[in-house]
Amino acid sequence: MSDQAPSVKPPAFGPGVVVKGTWHPDYAEVLTPEALEFVAKLARNFGERRLALLERRKTVQAAWSKGARPHFLPETKAVREGDWTVAPLPADLQDRRVEITGPVDRKMVINALNSGANVFMADFEDANSPTWDNVVRGQINLRDAVRGTISFTAENGKHYALNPKRAVLFVRPRGWHLPERHIEIDGKPISGSLLDFGLFFFHNAREQLARGTGPYFYLPKMQSHLEARLWNDVFHLAQAELGIPRGTIKATVLIETLPAAFEMDEILYELREHSAGLNCGRWDYIFSFIKTLQSDTRVVLPDRGQVTMDKAFLNAYSQLLIQTCHRRNVHAMGGMAAFIPIKGDAAANDAVMDKVRADKLREVKNGHDGTWVAHPGLVEIARDIFDSHMKGPNQLSNKREDVKIGEAELLKVPSGTRTEEGLRHNIRVGIQYTAAWLGGLGCVPLYNLMEDAATAEISRAQVWQWIHHGASLEDGRKVTLTLFRDALGEEMGRLEKEGAKERYGAAHLERARVLFEQLSTAGTFEDFLTLPAYDALEAQR
């Protein structure tokens, strides 16, 4: 069933609450008057503060674009140097050695919960294209998953259901910047963050507690401890409204923006009643590095395949994250292995799996307490590495007091080369992912990697950076608009020969090309691809 399918008119809800999206009868399972009144209360209490924090982002970015650089905040020095820890974690969050992530699609939810991972992060954010149907059905799917009743029968007759032993569920709502235009509160679109969090929490928190677990979340894209403070206040109100003890909610924050890396202690402190640690978000972090320092000619990056977690600013922030979390007695989660198994080519598959092993070995030896994978086929590989080197449930006792990371290390640019193939790869991947996203898919296998929105962001950001600063390729040529547009035309021809029109739809592919070209060649850097892409998604309804 899709957004465009015939539907009935949405029912009337409470004062000021309007559902503008299409309506299917089963939407009433989660879009109840009580649930929408709950999210309306969140919106009325926190909506203006959210918008003010988004305005603050613009002000801070303007200063960086004029030459200022991110730094540790002098006004929060006492927090960084203080002797405090976060609240104790529940039993089912002590061992998180392997976590799998994926969209809220019904079959994928079942497969991820059955994957053998310790945790499944169900994603309303980067792995989900936020069509109205995807958003609402994702909530239905998770409600059924929490109750153990979720099942799915594919067109070929294959039946999917939950195993008795399954992963602990986390949910990632959308970031603070994303609106949800299909629900208005007092004439304004609700925050996607508050809707995703609010609906899930309202329908499932008590049920999860009754089943011996709890409402656990991943929080994305934050840029400051003030944004973490907002989440903490949301949690307080939500728990009070449902009569659930304060501190029941636990949340892991993704450190996937450069500014947040300078405020990790502060973010943990703001969420200290609710914290379940921090996580390294690689692709978005690289994207944020480019965005934050967009005017600085000294930070033009090499091909993104050369910007790896063992290099320069990425290595520095991952080490500092471990030290910070363990000092506060909470988990430091490693990053994503986005590789997917390669069928029909044993040698290529072995090479990819060796890369995964090396990445996970680096993480566990550095002191991470767990790691992410994007495909069930990688769960066992990641688990074997962590089992061999992490004998207890976690490594919180490894305080990494040897780590000495300052502002210079967090801003250090890795050495490497820029190539025409690197440019073309960004074009191919960015356009294909965006085309799939416009077609309602947020999690897309491309060139043996499971890609999400962070991939499209880093692709267009890097192309913009190279063009904007006239970066030199390894053969001496400058990256110009002409070079980019010539490559774009040739890559579109290649994609069409490879069947991209049939795979994604000709209209989606063309919209993706236009959007990618606009963002890559704009005079100013667009904050998020997903904002104009959401406009395009809505325009085709």
UniProtKB/Swiss-Prot annotation:
The active site is at R172, D452. It catalyses: glyoxylate + acetyl-CoA + H2O = (S)-malate + CoA + H(+). It is found in: Cytoplasm. GO terms for biological process: glyoxylate cycle; tricarboxylic acid cycle. Gene3D superfamilies: Malate synthase, domain 3, Malate synthase, domain III. InterPro entries: Malate_synth_C_sf, Malate_synth_sf, Malate_synthA, Malate_synthase_CS, Malate_synthase_TIM, MS_C, MS_N, MS_N_TIM-barrel_dom. Its EC number is 2.3.3.9. Coiled coil: none annotated. Keywords: Cytoplasm, Glyoxylate bypass, Transferase, Tricarboxylic acid cycle. The keyword Transferase applies. One of its GO terms (molecular function) is malate synthase activity. One of its GO terms (cellular component) is cytoplasm. Pathway: Carbohydrate metabolism; glyoxylate cycle; (S)-malate from isocitrate: step 2/2. Belongs to the malate synthase family. This is Malate synthase. The gene is mls.
